[in-house]
Amino acid sequence: MKKLSIIFLSLTISLAAISQTASGILRYYLHRQATYDVVLDRLKRITYLGDSLTQIRYTDNTRHTILNHRIDSIVYIANSSVPNSPSNRAVNRNRNTDPQASQLEFPHRKEGEMNLLIKHSTPEYGNTYSLEWDCSKKSNRWTCYQMYDGNTCDNEKRNNTFREDEDIPTAYRTVLSQYVGSGFSRGHLCPAADRRCSKVQNQQTFYLSNMQPQYQRHNAGVWKRLETQVRAWNNTAFRDTLFVVKAATIDRDDQISGTTRSGLLIPKYFYMAILCKKDGHYQAIGLWTLHDEKKHSGDFSQYAISIDELERRTGIDFFCNLPDDIEDEIESRLNIDAWRIKTPHQSVRHIKNHRSQNN
């Protein structure tokens, strides 16, 4: 039995069954739908203050301080129940050390106190999405999330409840008035159509932290078509889980088109990184689009690049929590056929064949 040192000031929780196994995670559902995952096989101490989680200390003496978020509930998840987590025994030299960013969808975190990790979730459906927010730029670096049978439904309509993200300090967040008269749409990264299991889940996609200023023709054109393609991959015949990153370029001067009069940074490119796991096998693809007001090709293969190439263009390490051997293999190759990407000609032929079969 691994001994867990827990400090309780006024909160009492029984962890007897968990401490006997000392593996898996404790998932804390915190106030305002935030979650925090504690990795038990590295845990040294959990500190509480009243009914709030305050600090996690691990056996390597790293500490993670939580800003006194009130605990709504705690769930224990055994290793076998954590979907698609790589083995702790696998060699992984570039993984995120923050347990909050240990799932496969997370890119490598950018260091520095001005880069915030924000997570939105619901108790019923788990993590809605996570994002990295650059306070110095007041901009989203990336949004990431998973798609699988348990968190993608068709229960709710679009809510359109655009609002500020109060998890970001007031001085560093974007506000609704910045988009008014800017000439840009509030472009979703995690789209509302990907999160329709519940009203709260759908509403969470409308935080401005999940937006980038986007030309409407791009937003309703090529970006929307690529979003639809991702949802087409989200079926049990193709995947067990999709790990999705959606983002726009904010880090390099030559990949920024400028700023609006209200101070919104205008990305020059939008992109996606998709990892698919099916029956224990992985494949990955990058999708890269120029952000402009022109009409873009309907041939999705023109946007497809390898993850290695996407990393070269962005400077971001995607899917860093995979074991190194798997990461190196899947990120270096691009198999268009495996992703079943149709050219416009193939799409028309598919529609005609479908119609003839139903006549």
Task: Please describe what each predicted stretch is.
Residues Y29-H31, D41-N359:
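Domain-level detector for secreted/extracellular nuclease and nuclease-toxin modules, and
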Residues T21-V38:
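Short N-terminal segments immediately surrounding and downstream of signal-peptide cleavage
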Residues M1-G24:
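Bacterial Sec-dependent N-terminal signal peptides
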